[in-house]
């Protein structure tokens, strides 16, 4: 099955920005839930762990001045459309850096 332009446009319209996703993660932790239809203790625990990891990485990661300069000179607009769930460990490790990279260029954004 291939993804159509209409599906991508729909996903972009309903997507969250990164700060909103972090707020959602916090709300899910508070409610003892995870994203998605399936709810389990394991997924709830992964959500809790990922929220902690992402908060830590948001505080400790940085983009070097050299990389920032290269990003700021990149002429094209970019939107990172990320498909994820709150319990996904890979996203917890990568989204904080993707967000920091996108923040270096006003014409770049992250949607989840």
Please place each PLM-identified region on the residue numbering.
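Thiol-based oxidoreductase modules, predominantly thioredoxin-like and allied folds used
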Residues: 80-84, 98, 106-112
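Non-globular targeting/processing and membrane-anchoring segments
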Residues: 1-78, 100-104
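Conserved redox-active cysteine motifs that mediate thiol-disulfide chemistry
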Residues: 86-93
